[in-house]
């Protein structure tokens, strides 16, 4: 017992000495402030906006954005409106005029490119020929001086802003023929056109890949897409704060815009 009491007394002496040392150190040196925990952010993106937001995400992380986990989830437009309206997500991205009842901020105006398969030798196309192709009246590339190959028209969902802007700016409001294949997104369009030597389509310029290339209007010397663009918006249930605000400010910065508009130079 005596040994046990002596051991406990010795232990209490050591603890007291340790506390005294800690208090003394605390009096002479300020205790460092705790490092704030990195935030997480899950963002929604429509099919039109998805690849653009993925680019922004990657660029933000490469620039050293302070965030623990940054995710982009693909969602339908109606799902986005419902989730933002209910306050379930801090941030979402759409390519369309946003609902006036939600907080919104413009991110970028992205030029639309008319594109063909990289194997297509044509560099230019007359606007009337373009409209004939999309109306379904011109069906073989041989009619335009290219090697014989069936024209395969690929369009986007008619409710997409990219499709509307293309019809307004490039087709003069004309409709697209019923034989067109519908791609569900810009990256799907890029893949479809890249897979078919006879394909022609359109997409936002940051969806360009080495397997496709833009066509020009004959005589104008500028990509046809200079006449049409699609606008990317961020929407939120309320003005963003924290890492959501940090991400938006970076997206609107010159660095963010450069990341966003990769492949978009004339």
Task: Label the model's feature ranges.
Residues 13-25:
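Bacterial N-terminal signal peptides
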């Amino acid at each position: 017992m005596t040994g046990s009491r002596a051991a406990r007394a010795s232990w209490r002496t050591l603890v007291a000495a340790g506390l005294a040392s800690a208090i003394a150190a605390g009096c002479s040196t300020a205790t460092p402030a705790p490092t704030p925990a990195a935030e997480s952010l899950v963002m929604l993106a429509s099919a039109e906006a998805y690849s653009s937001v993925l680019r922004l995400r990657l660029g933000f992380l490469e620039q050293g954005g302070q965030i623990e986990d940054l995710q982009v989830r693909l969602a339908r437009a109606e799902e986005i409106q419902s989730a933002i309206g209910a306050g379930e997500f801090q941030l979402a991205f759409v390519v369309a005029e946003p609902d006036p009842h939600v907080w919104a901020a413009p991110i970028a105006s992205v030029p639309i490119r008319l594109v063909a398969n990289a194997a297509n030798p044509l560099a230019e196309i007359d606007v009337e020929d373009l409209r004939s192709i999309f109306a379904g009246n011109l069906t073989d590339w041989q009619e335009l001086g290219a090697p014989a190959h069936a024209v395969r028209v690929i369009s986007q969902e008619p409710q997409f802003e990219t499709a509307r802007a293309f019809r307004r700016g490039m087709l003069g409001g004309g409709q697209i023929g019923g034989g067109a294949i519908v791609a569900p997104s810009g990256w799907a369009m890029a893949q479809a056109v890249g897979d078919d030597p006879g394909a022609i389509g359109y997409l936002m310029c940051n969806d360009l890949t080495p397997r496709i290339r833009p066509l020009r209007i004959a005589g104008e010397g500028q990509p046809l897409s200079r006449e049409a663009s699609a606008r990317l918006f961020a929407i939120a249930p309320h003005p963003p704060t924290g890492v959501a605000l940090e991400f938006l400010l970076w997206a609107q910065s010159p660095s963010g815009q450069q990341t966003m508009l990769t492949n978009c130079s004339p």
